[in-house]
């Protein structure tokens, strides 16, 4: 059996966020292989999450994130089972990561696919069924293609199906499951709201010069009329000088 070092345990914890004992066990089960240990922990995390999913999660915190420039803001509620876990730095970091994820995903509108209203799915199906590239396809093939496209579209609207911005190899759903395995409690994203500065406001088109003049109590300057163009005439050729008259010779 390969000896598991503290450095290996630390590396695995940094990559997965799992607890120290879980990391040590994962490495032991996989002969010190980091990659296999990560897969083992993911499987364990999924199992742990399924077992804890039915538990009531009424504690937690409401996290916020304001993007640089103060043009995008996010509020998100993430729940756990006890306020002991809610106070832990690992949980606070998770909430902040989820808030940043929402800020980075303008198309995301729902926590999970199951939250998306049926009428939206029906509208997507109507759009896809009418596409020209499916016009000559057999009905059974068309249905399969449309189902795949709808599934992809609905996942684009779902937060839990987004690739995690800090690690594209996992989704937000997997991130939560890793946190469940590490913290030992059911953790759920309940709701969120994304704010964009000026969103939904129709901006009035204004004449900038007139606006400045109005603020200064002056009349807006009249536009300068273009000067009329004068057609230039070609210069007339100069008249030839008449030869001087010959004088009479004196006798």
Curated annotation (Swiss-Prot):
Keywords for the protein's UniProt record, in alphabetical order:
Cytoplasm, Elongation factor, Protein biosynthesis
Region of interest called Disordered, as start-end residue ranges on this chain: 215-251
- Decide whether keyword Protein biosynthesis is in the record: yes
Under CDD domains, the record lists: UBA_EF-Ts (cd14275)
Cellular component per GO, a single term: cytoplasm
Subcellular location(s) of the protein: Cytoplasm
What GO molecular function terms would the record report?
translation elongation factor activity
Which residue stretches does the UniProt record annotate as biased composition, category Basic and acidic residues? 230-239
The annotated regions of Low complexity compositional bias extend over: 219-229
Give the span(s) annotated as Involved in Mg(2+) ion dislocation from EF-Tu.
82-85
A Pfam family for this UniProt protein? EF_TS
What is the documented function of this protein? Associates with the EF-Tu.GDP complex and induces the exchange of GDP to GTP. It remains bound to the aminoacyl-tRNA.EF-Tu.GTP complex up to the GTP hydrolysis stage on the ribosome.
> Record's HAMAP family?
EF_Ts
| PANTHER family referenced in this protein's UniProt entry, alphabetically | ELONGATION FACTOR TS, POLYPROTEIN OF EF-TS, CHLOROPLASTIC
Task: Report the sequence similarity comment from the record.
Answer: Belongs to the EF-Ts family.
The entry's protein name is Elongation factor Ts
Q: Which organism is it from?
A: Microcystis aeruginosa (strain NIES-843 / IAM M-2473)
